[in-house]
Amino acid sequence: MLCTLFLLLLALGIVQTTRPCFPGCQCEEETFGLFDSFSLIRVDCSSLGPHIVPVPIPLDTAHLDLSSNRLETVNESVLGGPGYTTLAGLDLSHNLLTSITPTAFSRLRYLESLDLSHNGLAALPAEVFTSSPLSDINLSHNRLREVSISAFTTHSQGRALHVDLSHNLIHRLLPYPARASLSAPTIQSLNLSWNRLRAVPDLRDLPLRYLSLDGNPLATINPGAFMGLAGLTHLSLASLQGILQLPPHGFRELPGLQVLDLSGNPKLKWAGAEVFSGLGLLQELDLSGSSLVPLPETLLHHLPALQSVSVGQDVQCRRLVREGAYHRQPGSSPKVVLHCGDTQESARGPDIL
């Protein structure tokens, strides 16, 4: 795909030249490789006003910026002219879009990156992205209230998909139908922070590796809330102002979790080390800005792979291996402890004592 190739060629050197362009727009040609054998066109038509669409663009355009144009609607006729079918990146952010038609992107068969952030979108048509091999969709800062996971079914052929739904009004996320004709969306990164979710949504069967629920009004995290997310490696539950306690074994469905962020939860109380039961691969734990101050020995017992913990205000604890003054006896294990100090001290402290 064009975006992937673009990133691979960055290391080979870039030469930028200006090309003739539609009045008001800027067209830059970036050439790569030996003897400038490959080129991409980036067209910037931002901040010109709604009259700019549909705008003619060069046939070999890879990225089009239509941001900040006060656009109120986007449909197939706006995005269907010559040069649009090979687009790899499209920026429609900071407009006045309140809706998009189901076929708006149907001709963009090579589109990988789509930015619809900072608009007024209240709903997503079903299967609106199915024609494009998208790998990155930014829908942050809109007015979405109810979103169906099936809306993110793309023509990606198994490639990872990153979806940003942060800063919306989402109170309900509809799970993917178990008997759907199309395969489940390949969402690996999902940002749901700062919405209106009162419970952890059902995300089972998604190949998630990153999930953020920061800033939602979650009142509790029920047992089994993360069922079906065994591949998750990074979970952020920061700034959940309403949550008071975590259930014992609440994360046991996440055996592959490596990073857990529980920072900024001032009402969250310690409920025992059983909360972290089953997190045998967890390496980073952030408890800063919360009332959780567990004993280091307790954490290491339940989290054998733990490398660092943030607690209180600017206190960082790091995993240390104490070798002692004498050589260990054959078969004995070194003593592992958590050494805590301010962030600067932890940054320069040794790993082995």
From Swiss-Prot:
One GO CC term, this protein: extracellular matrix
Keywords: Developmental protein, Glycoprotein, Leucine-rich repeat, Neurogenesis, Repeat, Secreted, Signal
Entry-linked SUPFAM superfamilies: L domain-like
Subcellular locations according to the entry: Secreted
Placement of LRR repeats on the sequence: 60-80, 86-107, 110-131, 133-154, 160-180, 186-207, 208-228, 231-253, 256-277, 281-302
Assembly: Interacts with FZD4 (via FZ domain); competes with WNT2B for binding to FZD4, inhibiting Wnt signaling and repressing peripheral eye development. Interacts with TGFB1; the interaction contributes to regulation of the hair cycle. Interacts with netrin. Interacts with CCN2.
Additional information: This factor is named 'Tsukushi' because its expression pattern in chick embryos is similar to the shape of the Japanese horsetail plant, tsukushi.
Descriptive protein name: Tsukushi
UniProt source species: Rattus norvegicus
